[in-house]
């Protein structure tokens, strides 16, 4: 009798309409997935799964985000529900799309999460949405950064955003490499070794080189590389970020300002062992990369275990440029205009300086040209 009563109660629960409550707060970006989950449960309840295909694609456009989302809402041919400026739900027969957008300085990025009844409909919908975004769509590959940090209360926090992989590096900015910079990047991306350490003072081009590497990884992957990023010492002292990298889908782990993390373990470094396990393949991370940037002046201060062959691809000191190297960089950026290159270099460094950073040269390039002073004709003294 008790079993029969329990079964009757279970049947009553099944007959109840499915409902879900939502908190409209900072998690509004997840509303599309909540709606989709509701539909999935209903479909399973009647044994009719309607959305077996899932795709996630990204793009960027060099126009205001509001314009892009207005066009997606009005011109996609799908029923649209705008949640706020950068969040949109699109719905049609056999297809459902959640769109999230982010503003950048010179472009906006969009992430499309799409569910469809079949592959053909999914591909056709993606192509239609890209056409709506229009000719302003950035053709460069994107990479996705998951930034881990601590908030003002000391609690773990994160932010995820897309970056356009359009960084163009010139060899003249990296004379310390024994090969063209693109060749160096390609060798690292394809190498079995996971670790790359970039040493040097701020402004020498370490971050620019990291971005170019992530762009190359995206192009090689044929999709957006997923990057775990932090510069927070406290975050790295927790096991969770390492567990997420090992068990997740990230293609690279970038640790900036990692001075304390790279010092010798005999000097009290208790955090390096986690990276050694990942870099050594104790846990499987084939094809994934560990990139460190540090202000440590030379590799002699780094724990030797991290530099071991087979584990470390290279430890590169990205230094400041000599005056001659700075002039060659300026000349390259000025397309061979020697007069302009001399003005750029003069703006980037004082006459008593021996070195200049690549950042100082790039900054001088962005400054408007100074007008050339016009010489005044000599004054003629009037005579009686």
Predicted segments, located by residue:
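Short Lys/Arg-enriched alpha/beta "domain-start" segment
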Residues: 2-97
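C-terminal alpha-helical "lid" subdomain
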Residues: 83, 98-101, 314-384
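Charged, amphipathic alpha-helical linker segments immediately N-terminal to NTP-binding catalytic cores
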Residues: 135-178
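Short glycine-rich substrate-engagement loop in P-loop NTPases that contacts/grips substrate
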Residues: 177-179, 218-249, 268-269
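Pre-Walker A adenine-sensing motif
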Residues: 177-190
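Walker A/P-loop nucleotide-binding motif
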Residues: 193-210
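Conserved alpha-helical scaffold flanking the Walker A/P-loop in AAA+ ATPase domains
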Residues: 233-261, 272-282
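Conserved catalytic/switch belt of AAA+ P-loop NTPases
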Residues: 259-293, 297-308
């Amino acid at each position: 009798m008790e079993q029969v009563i329990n079964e009757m109660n279970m049947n009553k629960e099944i007959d109840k309409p499915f409902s879900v409550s939502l908190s409209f707060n900072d998690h509004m970006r997840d509303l599309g997935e909540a709606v989709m989950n509701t539909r999935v449960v209903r479909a399973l309840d009647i044994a009719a799964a309607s959305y077996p295909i899932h795709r996630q694609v990204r793009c960027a456009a060099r126009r205001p985000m509001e314009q892009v989302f207005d066009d997606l809402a009005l011109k996609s041919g799908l029923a649209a529900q705008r949640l706020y400026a950068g969040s949109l739900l699109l719905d049609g027969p056999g297809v459902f799309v959640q769109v999230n957008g982010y503003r950048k300085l010179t472009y906006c990025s969009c992430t499309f999460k799409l569910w469809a009844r079949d592959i053909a409909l999914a591909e056709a919908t993606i192509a239609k949405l890209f056409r709506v975004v229009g000719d302003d769509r950035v053709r460069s590959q994107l990479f996705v950064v998951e930034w881990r940090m601590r908030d003002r209360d000391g609690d773990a926090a994160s932010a995820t955003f897309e970056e356009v992989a359009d960084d163009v590096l010139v060899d003249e900015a990296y004379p310390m490499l024994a090969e063209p910079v693109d060749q160096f990047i390609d060798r690292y991306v394809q190498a079995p070794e996971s670790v790359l350490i970039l040493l040097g003072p701020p402004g020498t081009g370490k971050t620019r080189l990291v971005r170019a590497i992530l762009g190359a990884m995206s192009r090689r992957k044929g999709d957006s590389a997923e990057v775990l990023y932090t510069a927070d010492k406290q975050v790295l002292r927790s096991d969770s970020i390492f567990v997420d990298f090992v068990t997740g889908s990230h293609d690279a782990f970038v640790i900036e300002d990692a001075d304390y993390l790279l010092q010798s373990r005999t000097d009290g470094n208790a955090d390096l062992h986690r990276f050694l396990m990942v870099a050594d393949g104790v846990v499987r991370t084939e094809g994934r990369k560990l990139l460190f940037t540090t202000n440590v002046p030379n590799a002699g201060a780094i724990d030797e275990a991290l530099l071991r062959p087979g584990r470390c691809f290279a430890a590169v000191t990205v230094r400041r440029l000599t005056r001659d190297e700075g002039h060659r960089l300026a000349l390259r950026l000025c397309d061979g205009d020697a007069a302009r290159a001399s003005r750029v270099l003069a703006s980037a460094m004082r006459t008593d300086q021996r070195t200049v950073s690549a950042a100082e040269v790039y900054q001088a390039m962005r400054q408007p040209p100074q007008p050339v002073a016009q010489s005044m004709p000599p004054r003629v003294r009037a005579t009686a």
